[in-house]
Curated annotation (Swiss-Prot):
This protein's encoding gene: uup
Highest taxon above the source species: Bacteria
The protein's name in its UniProt record: ATP-binding protein Uup
Source organism (scientific name): Caulobacter vibrioides (strain ATCC 19089 / CIP 103742 / CB 15)
Domain-related comment: The C-terminal domain (CTD) helps bind DNA.
Coiled coil (UniProt feature): none
TM region positions: none
Length: 608
């Protein structure tokens, strides 16, 4: 016998809201039962944050519809930009009604000192403080708007653990796929101003959404055919204007309005492209024995790496570990205490920075895109009107003359992308590029970077983003320890599962047990260096494996061409060229097989 349906703890019914003449919600229904953890997904500008505010009963009121909260239920909302008040973090965390001991435990879970001043916090500290306060209040419903922004990977994992342990229902807006995959069991899709519901976690969402979009596209094609037929009917003359055909004419006008609505949504699709600035040298960056300290704190010690043309290198580590510092060291923008850094030839660097430092609040969007003045921007070598280019990044004409201060976090990020992508580049550096981006823009950015034929250095906390893009990952533990492994975040953790364990006690984020009443013990000694191949050897091993796999087909094709008895007499130049290519392919295969055997033997010896 099926279990009875539970009454929702928070619900919306037939909610409608318009932004001026533009409808935002048109009959939205949403119900959240106790202890259900769900995500709210939707494209840029769909109104996800607005809907959370309506659910929270804070700041936005619907034009019509109902909001129902279970009697006695406590709803807590954490916005994208929480404001921290009070003298200390404990003052802030108890302001919502939590007891001191509850607030202290929650702050400790997120690695925060209750006595720390509430002023001058970093973005990550602000976010952790807001989350700690929310959990300390023990809500029945938790509404989270982009909760992983500015958090490092370890703080995100703590948030995942807190959600799993909590008895509250939760509705989450986030672009972080790995996070949503781990914490959600239901998806609400805000699309076409209504809500569609999937009673499965986010891991099932994208396949489900694609099937719905395919069905919608087929329905749109059917409606277009009907509209074409009805337009022809109306064009035949006055018959279409007679009273007895008024119903048919109204239906035609409704079809036209629906098509116009669909077209306006399609126009809200962002486009991106990037052009290489020409080929850089094969060696992009070579660092040897690099050491950097700030006072007594070591960022990196005796670190060496080589970044080659086409590499996609991710940098990960706790907030404050020195990832941005290492980027500046590798680019030669910061003096080293020891070691050398050599940059390759013909480098054109494009840098999108974490703190959005390139954006001045005093200028407008137009001014930022045209630093030299005028009404045109040079895009990949050709002039383009700034208004047209801005529209490709979803900026309206009205926004062009607005100050940067009026932009949301996601809009600021898009503005930086717009300017950076206008210039040809062969070395792109992105420092936390996924903050504030919606999933559609994030997908587009991933596609762009995957097709980019230059070199990429990426600082990110987004595990899924790293796994999809990175060819290698450099991890910093915050105490000078650095490890580099092929692949993304998952590969890093598979190969170095204990790397960060010894470091947490000394980094900016150090979670503490709720039961802890004494200071945390000193961190254990850093683990011994893993007995594995060096990064260079591992990279060469993989290159050899790839060459061994593809060479037989190449050799067979060349041998087939040479089997033509008339090739030499018909085209001696092609015969010679093919023969040389065959000799080279055979020699390369033999060399790769020899190196592979040597490296595999070395790997076995290291493993003991």
């Amino acid at each position: 016998m099926a279990s009875p349906a539970r009454a929702p703890v928070l619900a919306l019914k037939d909610v409608r809201l318009a932004d001026g003449a533009k409808p935002l919600f048109d009959g939205v229904d949403l119900a959240l039962e106790p202890r259900v953890r769900a995500c709210l997904v939707g494209r840029n500008g769909a109104g996800k944050s607005t809907l959370l505010k309506i659910l929270a009963g804070q700041g936005v009121e619907a034009d019509s519809g109902e909001r129902a909260v279970q009697p006695g239920a406590k709803v807590v909302y954490v916005s994208q930009e929480p404001e921290i008040t009070g003298e200390t973090l404990l003052d802030y965390a108890t302001a919502g009604g939590a007891q001191d001991y509850e607030a202290q435990a929650a702050l400790a879970d997120f690695g925060l000192d209750p006595d720390k001043s509430a002023k001058g916090l970093s973005g990550g500290e602000t976010r952790r403080a807001a989350l700690a306060r929310a959990f300390a209040e023990q809500p029945d419903v938790l509404l989270l708007d982009e909760p992983t922004n500015h958090l490092d990977i370890f703080a995100i994992q703590t948030l995942e653990d807190e959600l799993a342990a909590s008895k509250c229902a939760a509705l989450i807006v986030s672009h972080d796929r790995a996070f949503l995959n781990r914490v959600t069991e239901r998806c609400f899709w805000l699309e076409h101003r209504k809500i569609r519901r999937l009673d499965k976690g986010f891991s099932e969402f994208e396949a489900w959404a694609e099937s719905i979009m395919a069905a919608d596209a087929e329905e749109a094609r059917r409606l277009d055919k009907v509209l074409e037929r009805e337009n022809a009917w109306l064009a035949r003359g006055v018959q279409g204007r007679r009273a007895r055909n008024e119903g048919r004419r109204r239906a035609l006008l409704a079809l036209r309005a629906e098509k116009k609505d669909r077209q306006s949504e399609l126009r809200g699709t962002m486009t991106m492209a990037v052009e290489s600035a020409g080929t850089s040298g094969k060696r992009v960056v070579e660092a040897k024995g690099v050491t950097k300290r700030f006072g007594e704190r070591t960022i990196v010690e005796n670190f060496s790496t080589r970044i080659l043309r086409g590499d996609r290198v991710a940098l990960v580590g706790p907030n404050g570990a020195g990832k941005t510092t290492l980027v500046k060291l590798l680019l030669g923008e910061l003096e080293r205490d020891a070691g050398t850094v050599q940059l390759g030839t013909n480098l054109e660097v494009s840098y999108i920075d974490q703190a959005r430092m390139a954006l001045s609040d005093k200028i407008t969007v137009w001014d930022f895109l045209t630093p030299g003045g005028g009404d045109s921007i040079i895009v990949r070598g050709h002039p383009k009107h700034v208004a047209g280019y801005a529209k490709e990044f979803l900026f309206t004409d009205a926004q062009l003359r607005q100050p940067v201060t009026s932009l949301s976090g996601g809009e600021r990020n898009r503005l930086l992308l717009a300017r950076a992508l206008a210039n040809p580049t062969n070395l792109m550096v992105l420092d936390e590029p996924t903050n504030d981006l919606d999933m559609d823009t994030l997908d587009l950015l991933e596609d762009l970077l995957a097709d980019f034929d230059g070199t990429l250095i990426l600082v990110s906390h987004d595990r899924d983003f790293i796994d999809r893009l990175a060819s290698s990952t450099i991890a910093l533990d915050g105490k000078g320890g650095v490890v580099e492994t092929p692949g993304g975040w998952t590969d890093l953790m598979d190969q170095n599962p204990d790397f960060f364990k010894a470091s947490k006690g000394g980094t900016a984020f150090a979670p503490v047990s709720k039961a802890a009443t004494k200071p945390a013990p000193a961190a254990p000694a850093a683990p011994k260096k893993s007995a594995k191949l060096s990064y260079k050897d591992q990279r060469r091993l993989e290159e050899c494996e790839a060459l061994i796999a593809k060479s037989p087909a190449i050799i067979a094709k060349l041998e087939e061409a040479l089997a033509d008895p008339n090739l030499y007499t018909r085209d001696p130049a092609t015969f010679d060229k093919t023969m040389k290519a065959l000799d080279k392919a055979r020699a390369d295969l033999e060399q790769a097989e020899m190196e592979w055997l040597e490296l595999e033997e070395k790997k076995e010896n290291l493993a003991g």
